[in-house]
Every structure is written in structure tokens, then in C-alpha cells.
Amino acid sequence: QPQASWYLLLAQQPDPHLTVGDTHYADTTDPTVQWKHHVTYRRQKEFATVLRNVPTYAIWDDHDYGPNNSDGTAKGKERSLAGWKQVWGNPTLGTTDTPGAFFKFSHGDVDFFMVDSRYHRSPDKVPDDDEKRMLGDAQFAWLLDGLRNSTARFKVIVSGSTLNHSKVDGWRIYTFSRHRVFDAIKKHRISGVMYMSG
């Protein structure tokens, strides 16, 4: 079916364009199934036009990473990451020591921190204490270091997981991780921080 809403996006002449999770609903780490979903998505004429004309950056969420509400225990997550690297033209993902789909890019006076809220995530149902993680310690350190060293006027943290008070599948049920981000921004007096989610 035609997806004319993509033309509404193009009419705004965006630069850049971000897809913030659940770009498809494969709900598996099986690379063959994921690949079919990625190809189907790109065959959509309107979306293909966006990709050809607008710099596009992408982060995943549960459905394009693995099963619904999946986390760092997902079997085959390494295959998901390998496939993600093949289909999206993001900058280098993760770090030398920490795998994942997270990365940073800059546009004008804005630094975007695309965080991976799946690869190192603790299961939703474990106790909501100071052992429960949304990003994992290494990725959190990467984020904090990036925010502290950024000279951009605005720093945008981008994640497929919502920051609001929903008690389903978002930062709200990761109290320690959520407040660790807030507290670090306050402690280090980092200005211009915003949060974006899909």
C-alpha cells in the first residue's frame, strides 16, 4: 500500500532524518527473516525516496532487534547487530570494547547520541534496583563522556525506549538507570540536553 506520509516528510526538507526504533517488526534475531523485512521496507517506493534524498540515521528498538520486549539476554543478538550494520549507513557502531548499535553524529550545533537500549539491557521483569540497567555500564560511560565533552549548543539523547511514566517497556521501570542519567547531567552541569524517542 502507498505510504504518502513519507512525502509529507520530504516536503519539510529535513536534514537529517532519524528513525527511532521498530523500523520493522521481524520479532526475531534470525538474520534471514530480518533481511527480508529490511528489503521489504526499502522496496516501499516512498520510503526509498526518503533514503535517496535525505541523510538518514537509525537506531533499533525491540521489534527490529529481536522478539517483543527483548533485552540483553536475547539469543542471536550478535547476528542482529551484524545485519543492522549491513543495512544502515550509520557511523561506526559501539566501541572497540563494547558492542552495540549506539553511535554519535553531529549536525550543525547539535550532537546526537543514538543510544542502544536493547543490547545490554537487563530484563524488564528483574527487580527495579540499582543492579538493573537500561544501557549497561560501558555504554552509559560512553554517553556521559560524550555529553561532558560536547561543545555543541544542544545534545540530543535518542532512544527507542520512552522516558515518560509508562510502566511498560520504557525507562520508567528502570529507575536507577533513569536517575543515573538525570543525576549525571545535573552533577556535571551539562547544558542543552534533550531526549528524543519514537
What positions do the PLM features span?
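Metal-dependent phosphoester/phosphodiester hydrolase catalytic core
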Residues: Q1-G198
